[in-house]
Amino acid sequence: MVGLVSISDRASTGVYEDKGIPALQEWLAGALRSPWRAETRLIQDDAPTISATLTELVDVAGCDLVLTTGGTGPARRDVTPEATLAVATKEMPGFGEQMRQISLNFVPTAILSRQVAVIRETADHAALIINLPGQPKSIRETLEGLRDADGKSTVPGIFAAVPYCIDLIGGPYIETDAAVVAAFRPKSAQRTPR
């Protein structure tokens, strides 16, 4: 199960339509070959609400992966990273570093992004939680990575590492569509595709 959380004061109050959750659902539908279902939440940019939502998705709903979108900039109301770190048992800094590296190919303000990724563990379950950018185009770019004019991957997106991370924390074996994003696993962890 995948938790999808869009964090936006204005979208959560109906000022405008949320684009984060639909973008994540569309991308996952094209990228995942394994069966999956989503638990979605559209919430305000408020640290206690974000932390409570992440905790509920992992501890109660049993999500193995939670993707958030929004609330990662430097504005005073942007508290997604702090709320995510508050529920973490382990930090996974490489995900945020790679997202900023990918986004810097497009905009110099990517350096202002504060996305984090963490593991949340309970006695019998663990999940990977990743903060993604707020814009659908940036979500796709950071998940897929960069390609040259011929469509060959030049910079891997962060999702290439997600299936193996889920393996390592005891979650289900996730298969991806290599045309969208090729999951990387060491040979010893690979299975024959179904």
Give residue spans per PLM region:
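Non-catalytic beta/alpha edge segments that cap or flank active sites
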Residues: 1-194
